[in-house]
């Protein structure tokens, strides 16, 4: 019954997508009509169209009204500049992006070009468009190629990556369209909200963004906040002792492991044992807490494994991203977990950090007025994307029909039998000459499989997060579609890689040309380069290559400081056939075209041979916890209508089945399996596995949703504090802010006297008031305060007099010094106390869950407690400003 309901549900979804797409086909026909008219325009007239569109928008025309015409202009520019005539499906993808939705476009369907059309349209508002990518390489690649379309149409294009200096960031953010990575835009946002001078600000208000690999950023990365941190004291001895203690404790006796929620639960015996060994009364004591260190040490021991969750390189524990398989050297686990792993691996324990500013990607991208995104896999997560970001997913049809065969899973009883079967399948496919991509879930398993293939003497490439393999990533992926190629990879090959049957011709040619010129660039020796004698080409082609090489050598003599990176950028432009008047690029292009003519015929022959034997064979060695990650692996095969196949080899010992599969699946498999060595291939079991994955996805979604609900409370406070901070930074009337803070402080203290005297001892309130009078240099003493009738006007009047005296005193040292002092003091107090507040909120969130045992809603409790903490922080900021400002003493220079 459940299966039939799933089929019916999928049919309904397919029909809804059809109805949505029908609307886009109508708009597409309008675009085509405009395109026919625009083809007649000269390049200059096409460029003038941008100015015309801007005027029409200012006159009140909506973006939707001019969409067909702007898309026609941008598509015509793409053909003239890049020689790319957009497919209909790319135009439809662009319309979907403009509407603030997610376009699900499969591998090789041209997402970068599709994004150019809505980017151009929305940039006409002159409020800026950000195209967000997941790494620097993709940002630069699209900036250098697709960016030429915008420049041709008279728009300014910016690029921001980790190497962009602060001095250039502001101008790049002010560009009409800016290519930037998700991490850079997040850290720039945080840095802007820690700036102490207006000139340090880099960003303008967020308007519209197009996020590439949107599911990776908004779902996979959503749990990981961006953090700017400062150093704090670290109790290294506690981490080391906790590690030794964790090694002594025994699983199932002293503690239990909850693998579903990835947590450790200490038993009563475990708690008593820890307290006895440490010679303390309680590991949960607030004065000398040990619980935090013990739990982290046990997590490091049981849940965080070397070569699975992290690698050790150069005496450092480096995180491996579970979704991409890549290392993240700049990131560290928070709350002391990373220090516990360092203690476990006997590495130097680095200092703990204190959070100065933080934000999640969820809340960062919700700052935009309009968000859209593109990816090859998002439909399975549509409910989450709609509920949190209001982003529906529209599946864009492929340009060519998908003919890849996705075979039912092969299921084994044991891990060993499964890996043997994978190896045998690789041998079988290899004998046929089919290229094979084997996807594994972590480094450890990829290396085991590599050893098994070595036993069969099968040559293969290994791609995982280890440095020696990462260096060869581009080369491995470029060759992965060639005949007889066998590639074993972690999730590194699951996203953003384009495996071309027969091999990647562009990569090979670029590599050849780079190797020709590398000696010149590195040594500066501009002697004649000898062409590879194995090059199969005519004498005329050799002469043409040599002629262009000589021209480039002469240009190198004029610019001897050219770097490999700069040469690579020029070669990228040359290979893309982008129009250029640069003599250096034109000569490189001539060489590229000659090499292309020589090698293309050989690659075409091999491509045809690979297609005839079945295309790329993708083998998954384990189902991931998310169907989306599995689909990304499958999507490496069958690009742009190519033949191919995918199959998953699974065992009962895999984490998904062991932790989440349940007894039902296990019983089904034992019933169906004839023997330990014989696998099962059953659509019914495959659907049961899908069901298990959905359970895990639901679990993770609920966890992310809960995090989002908690983070929204902190986010509302962040918005309030950052808004006030920005107003102070930009204010010309800083005196008004100072007086407001000081007046509110006095009013708070007076309210304490009148309203809360029953809660606070009277002598404490009187002491606070007496401090104010001391600061204001008032003759009223504590004795007089007892008989004094508090009059707000009198005190505030005294405040104004005292402030004027202090200002005159400080400005004697340097004219305008008081104003600078006030601004820096207020900003410093906001930053310091906000950082403390973040720490307190983190502790609150960590322990608020225990309120559930008292039949209280932890979220409501968190909201109430956080409000009290926020008000307390605001009062502390104001009070500190009052006290510090009146205590400030100028240093006079009598020299």
Swiss-Prot record:
Annotated localization: Plastid, Chloroplast stroma; Plastid, Chloroplast thylakoid membrane
Superkingdom of the organism of origin: Eukaryota
Entry keyword set: ATP-binding, Chloroplast, Membrane, Nucleotide-binding, Plastid, Protein transport, Thylakoid, Translocase, Translocation, Transport
Membrane topology: Peripheral membrane protein
Listed SUPFAM superfamilies: Helical scaffold and wing domains of SecA (SSF81886), P-loop containing nucleoside triphosphate hydrolases (SSF52540), Pre-protein crosslinking domain of SecA (SSF81767)
Protein's name in the database: Protein translocase subunit SecA
Enzyme class: translocase
Similarity comment: Belongs to the SecA family.
Reaction catalysis annotation: ATP + H2O + cellular proteinSide 1 = ADP + phosphate + cellular proteinSide 2
Binding-site residues, ATP: 90, 108-112, 498
HAMAP family the UniProt entry points to: SecA
A GO BP annotation: protein targeting
MF GO annotations: ATP binding; protein-exporting ATPase activity
Enzyme Commission number(s) of this protein: 7.4.2.8
Function: Has a central role in coupling the hydrolysis of ATP to the transfer of proteins across the thylakoid membrane.
GO-annotated cellular components: chloroplast stroma; chloroplast thylakoid membrane
